[in-house]
A protein has these predicted regions:
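Positively charged n-region of N-terminal signal peptides that target proteins for export
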Residues: 1-4, 117-119
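Sec-dependent N-terminal signal peptides
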Residues: 3-13
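Subset of outer-membrane beta-barrel
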Residues: 16-293
């Protein structure tokens, strides 16, 4: 446990305070974040906003996980979409003995729209504005656990995302997504820019119930790209299975979704679970619940 904690503390010490987490949502976790391209509302709300373009429902999605299976690293998210607009919320914190040592919150507002469409092809675009807030918590104090420490303050930041997608015959998808293409951080102690990531996604649907996706993800300033591959297969109308692989680092993921349960003929519910391994740390487990009106 001390070894794991040391790794996390060292990684935090040498990284920017405002984090970049690509596996938000059960589907993204299960498919190793190979979700840049395709047609899925969860991916549109939390990732490439171009996938919001053809949405015509009201959807509410919420999820929770402890990163790497550690109780002191809780991650929660909520997303709401109506037509081609979406609102997303994410919170990740570090907690110890009931005290919050640090907390990061992200609020995003997104819109997707069609640039061009005909009988066979479609070109989509999406925009998202993100507002970030980071609370530094309190110092260790005389007790050493932060219970009576001094407030260390907070900081705010903002970022802008943009995504594009081309669709052919609703079977072939090519997408490009840039996160934090433009950003601003109050003050200068946290760095000049938010983490910027660029993703290229390819998806192919050989038939209606099977989705295969390939992503190439590049974090700005990192010379190595991440290659991600994901599969989603609908076994039956109410049950889907998902799996994925990633390189740099090597990770494996899988999960399922059980749903399309109609309640009072007003809305449908879906429950999903997924896990994602890590090359050093324990496995992350993700639970999500969605309601579609």
């Amino acid at each position: 446990m001390k070894y794991i904690l040391s790794i996390i503390l060292l990684s935090i010490s040498f990284s920017q305070v405002f984090s970049s987490y690509d596996y938000l949502g059960s589907r993204a976790t299960a498919m190793s974040a190979a979700i840049t391209s395709g047609d899925h509302i969860e991916s549109g709300i939390f990732h490439n906003p171009a996938q919001l373009s053809n949405n015509s429902n009201i959807t509410i999605i919420s999820g929770y996980s402890n990163l790497y299976g550690l109780d002191f690293l809780p991650l929660s998210h909520v997303g709401i979409s109506k037509n081609n607009y979406a609102l997303s919320f994410k919170n990740i914190s570090t907690e110890f003995n009931g005290n919050t040592l640090s907390s990061e919150t992200a609020l995003g507002v997104a819109k997707g729209f069609n640039l061009y469409s005909d009988r066979q092809s479609l070109i989509q675009m999406g925009l998202r504005f993100n507002f970030y807030s980071y609370d530094f918590g309190e110092s260790a104090g005389t007790e050493g656990d932060g219970s009576n420490g001094i407030n260390l303050g907070s900081s705010n930041a903002s970022g802008f995302d943009i995504g594009f997608q081309g669709v052919l015959n609703k079977k072939y998808y090519v997408a490009y997504y840039i996160k934090n293409i433009s950003s601003y951080i109050e003050g200068s102690s946290l760095g000049l820019n938010l983490p910027k990531t660029m993703s290229i996604g390819l998806s192919y649907l050989p038939y209606k119930d099977l989705v295969t996706s390939l992503d190439i993800n590049q974090l700005s300033g990192n010379k190595d790209s991440e290659i991600r591959f994901g599969i989603e297969y609908k076994l039956m109308e109410s049950f889907k299975i998902r799996t994925g692989l990633q390189s740099n680092p090597n990770r494996f993921s899988a999960g399922f979704e059980f749903g399309n349960i109609k309640l009072a003929n007003l809305y449908t519910c879906n429950f999903s679970y997924s896990f994602l391994t890590h090359h050093v740390l324990p496995t992350t487990h993700q639970f999500s619940l969605s309601v579609k009106f």
